[in-house]
């Protein structure tokens, strides 16, 4: 029995399902989860000592690779001064200033510890600001595990075939309206019917939790116009795509400004950190200035702030995003070419340093199209690549991530492995 199997059996005795986040359990793809012992650059090693090329990167944060020496040094410097204070620090101001500089729509920002906290707090703030209750979200978009957002969500819910989580009261779900992603007509119809009841529209401008699905410019521009017309707050959930698709995130890529933005992953540099921010007049409703309460014992934790601040500084290097985008595109295009050569129906897409793999005839644009992908074939591909030492997301409904340490040799090795995997699928 492998060490991974031993650890998984042991974990299941004290941890529900043996994992602390459902997708890690390999329930979708089958088999035994890999227990990580260490990581460096684009690689990690499992409990059996096997090396893998990592295309998850802790689900997005590791944009400069695992254990970047400058991030490590920044964390080591603050450790000796204390782990957590429950009081403000100068470093919190510095990371806030950096975020506001990089995302111009954010005039003020508040740090929290997770993406769920960020989206949950942003929605409460939008409701407090507008005095309205209804929120609009989109099918397949995942915004964390707050009750009102677990209605027809993506990520683990989609992976496990449960569109809405058990335990979400009907009285809460009734305030959430779910529309089809990228469907402008449905959006216009909803605003026409109850636009003046809508407190906020929350959207992943680049969805990464029903695999990678891009918001179309027409859809996102319609969102902006309708929210402005009806006085609703437009919330861009950029927890995943923020600092991933461009230095200024999806708002820079599309040239569209949100009222509130949720960030996470990259801004913690691998540590637990997230944030929400936006227009000053909206943020002024947060306690202690206003009546919308939000708090957190570990918000602005000095260790997380140190890792995040150094990461934000590193990604501003000249040419960083040009190189990262080109490398991610080379991976996606190369995988599609290998599949074509083997005669396997397959499509791939990338934007910035995010990519999507689809066992389908074309790149999907909606939740409905995503669910038509051949998940059985994906599962076989996943395990073939795992055997080759390449670690993709263990679900057909999750995006992948490339770091600045995924150099040509790493991409070449991945494509060579994929050539063998696609050949086996076609046999």
Curated annotation (Swiss-Prot):
One of its GO terms (biological process) is protoporphyrinogen IX biosynthetic process. It is found in: Cytoplasm. Its EC number is 5.4.3.8. Its main location: cytoplasm. CDD domains: OAT_like (cd00610). It holds the Pfam family Aminotran_3. SUPFAM superfamilies: PLP-dependent transferases. The modification N6-(pyridoxal phosphate)lysine is found at residue 265. Its cofactor is pyridoxal 5'-phosphate. One of its GO terms (molecular function) is transaminase activity. Keywords: Cytoplasm, Isomerase, Porphyrin biosynthesis, Pyridoxal phosphate. Homodimer. Belongs to the class-III pyridoxal-phosphate-dependent aminotransferase family. HemL subfamily. This is Glutamate-1-semialdehyde 2,1-aminomutase.
């Amino acid at each position: 029995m492998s060490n991974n199997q031993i650890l998984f059996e042991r974990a299941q005795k004290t941890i529900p399902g043996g994992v602390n986040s459902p997708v890690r359990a390999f329930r979708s793809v089958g088999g035994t989860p890999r227990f990580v012992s260490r990581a460096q650059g684009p690689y990690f090693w499992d409990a059996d000592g096997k090396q893998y090329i990592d295309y998850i990167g802790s689900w997005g944060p590791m944009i400069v690779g695992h254990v970047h020496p400058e991030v490590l040094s920044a964390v080591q410097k603050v450790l000796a001064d204390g782990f957590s204070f429950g009081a403000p620090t100068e470093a919190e101001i510095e990371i806030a200033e950096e975020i506001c500089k990089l995302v111009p729509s954010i005039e003020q920002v508040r740090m929290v510890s997770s993406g769920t906290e960020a989206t949950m707090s942003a929605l409460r703030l939008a409701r407090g600001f507008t005095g309205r209750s209804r929120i609009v979200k989109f099918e397949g978009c995942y915004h964390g595990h707050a009750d009102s957002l677990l209605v027809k969500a993506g990520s683990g819910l989609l992976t496990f075939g449960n569109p809405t989580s058990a335990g979400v009261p009907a009285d809460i779900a009734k305030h959430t309206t779910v529309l089809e992603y990228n469907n402008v007509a449905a959006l216009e119809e909803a605003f026409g019917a109850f636009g003046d009841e809508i407190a906020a529209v929350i959207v992943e401008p680049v969805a990464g939790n029903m695999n990678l699905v891009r918001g179309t410019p027409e859809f996102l521009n319609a969102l902006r116009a309708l929210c402005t017309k009806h006085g609703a707050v437009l919330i861009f959930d950029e927890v995943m795509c923020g600092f991933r698709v461009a230095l200024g995130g999806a708002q820079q890529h599309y040239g569209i400004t949100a009222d509130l933005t949720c960030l996470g992953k990259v801004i913690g540099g691998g540590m637990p950190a997230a944030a929400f921010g936006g227009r000053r007049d909206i943020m002024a409703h947060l306690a202690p200035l206003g009546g919308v309460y939000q708090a957190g014992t570990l918000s602005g934790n000095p260790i997380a702030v140190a890792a995040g601040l150094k990461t934000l500084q590193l990604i501003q290097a000249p040419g960083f995003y040009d190189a990262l985008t080109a490398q991610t595109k080379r991976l996606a295009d190369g995988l599609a070419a290998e599949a074509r050569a083997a005669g396997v129906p397959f499509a791939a897409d990338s934007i910035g340093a995010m990519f999507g793999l689809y066992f389908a005839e074309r790149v999907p644009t909606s939740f409905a199209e995503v669910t038509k992908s051949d998940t059985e074939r994906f599962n076989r591909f996943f395990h073939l690549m795992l055997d080759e030492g390449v670690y993709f997301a263990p679900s057909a409904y999750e995006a992948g991530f490339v770091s600045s340490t995924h150099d040509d040799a790493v991409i070449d090795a991945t494509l060579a492995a994929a050539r063998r995997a696609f050949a086996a699928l076609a046999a």
